[in-house]
Design a protein with these regions (language model features):
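One-carbon transfer enzymes
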Residues: 1-198
Length: 198
């Protein structure tokens, strides 16, 4: 299976996916390209170190969002991937891309959907919401991407009791953090052979 990984930041989840492929936890999978909207994202360096094509496609480089959306989809299509993994990608996915890649784009959201999800809940903002509400159980949700925000069909969820919560990490009773959960969820999905409906 050929995958593209889209990421906006440091790429700790990307690195965990790379490592899982390298050590055989994830099999029959190859990362064709890593795409970031941020030229300074360390994820691009991680990809290069692993011998993976690294590309920056930033909305700021285009005259309009429509022009960005068109080029983003064109470049993604050029890699002929089977699956797109959003690993902390802070860009709204273009509707045409969702249509072309229906049930082939997955996102791992750092909460148990339907809690702390939707517009405004991303990255540390999710953890701020968890902290403010004082919840005792949190986790991560792997879901297909649709036209809504965190509304696609849920594939897997991983939960645990919150024992320490800071704005940098959510440590769960199971010993996992969001950074650990994402590649594990991807690995489980790929290893359990979830079929992609095209």
């Amino acid at each position: 299976m050929k995958i593209a990984v889209c990421v906006s930041g440091g790429g700790t989840n990307l690195q965990a996916i790379i490592d899982a492929i390298d050590n055989g936890t994830i099999t029959n999978t190859q990362i064709e390209v890593v795409i970031s909207n941020n030229a300074d994202a360390y994820a691009l360096e991680r990809a290069k170190k692993a011998g993976i094509k690294a590309v920056c496609i930033s909305p700021k480089s285009y005259e309009s969002r429509a022009a960005f959306n068109e080029d983003f989809l064109k470049q993604l299509n050029s890699y002929h991937v089977d699956l797109v993994v959003l690993a902390g990608f802070l860009v709204v996915i273009p509707p045409e891309m969702i249509k072309q890649y229906r049930n082939r784009i997955i996102n791992i959201h750092p909460s148990l959907i339907p809690s702390f999800c939707g517009t405004g809940y991303y990255g540390l903002k999710v953890h701020e919401g968890v902290l403010a509400r004082g919840v005792k159980v949190t986790g991560a949700t792997c879901h297909f991407v649709d036209e809504g925000t965190d509304t696609g069909p849920i594939i897997l969820q991983n939960s645990g009791l919150v024992i320490i919560l800071t704005l940098l990490n959510v440590y769960l009773f199971s010993g996992d953090s969001h950074r650990c959960s994402q590649p594990r969820q991807c690995a489980l999905m790929l290893l359990h052979g979830i079929r992609i409906a095209v």
